[in-house]
């Protein structure tokens, strides 16, 4: 147990809550319009839904842990903390990060880019005011946490140090 690992875990929990919730909302937006979750149904949404494509991209990049997003901060700190104990664990974690990046990039490419082949998609509308008022603040949060992580990390430092010291006392270190 070390401070980097615990700080990373806390930031990752916050990030995962925001990003995963936002990705589910993004799925809900297109499901609400098209009533299907089949990836093969979509393609070319950037042409009809540029705001949706932008916020979806921010959440997808946060999910894969791109630097400048909340996902990077948490993943980086967890990996730094884990590296102090086991490089094998780090290799496993890094492999999972790479696999999730491949899946998310494929998903984004398939849904957002390409040519609109489905006639129903030619009439799809971009985000309405309600959807924007929910998704845009979440996208801003993903970026703010990624650029200014100390906003969240600094208030956690003392409690994390107390957890570590209690852990060390309990384990006779």
PLM regions: where:
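Cytoplasmic/organellar membrane-interface segments at the starts of transmembrane helices
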Residues: 49-51, 104-173
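Functional transmembrane alpha-helices
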Residues: 1-125
């Amino acid at each position: 147990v070390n401070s980097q690992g615990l700080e990373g875990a806390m930031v990752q929990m916050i990030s995962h809550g925001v990003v995963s919730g936002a990705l589910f909302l993004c799925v809900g937006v297109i499901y609400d319009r098209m009533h299907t979750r089949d990836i093969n149904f979509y393609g070319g949404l950037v042409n009809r839904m540029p705001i949706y494509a932008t916020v979806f991209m921010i959440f997808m990049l946060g999910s894969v842990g791109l630097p400048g997003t909340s996902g990077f901060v948490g993943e980086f700190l967890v990996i730094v903390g884990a590296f102090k104990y086991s490089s094998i664990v780090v290799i496993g974690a890094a492999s999972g990060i790479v696999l999730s990046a491949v899946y998310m990039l494929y998903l984004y490419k398939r849904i957002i880019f390409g040519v609109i082949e489905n006639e129903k998609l030619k009439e799809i509308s971009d985000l309405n005011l309600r959807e924007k008022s929910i998704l845009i603040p979440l996208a801003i949060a993903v970026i703010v946490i990624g650029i200014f992580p100390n906003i969240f990390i600094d208030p956690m430092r003392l409690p994390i140090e107390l957890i570590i010291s209690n852990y060390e006392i309990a384990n006779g270190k």
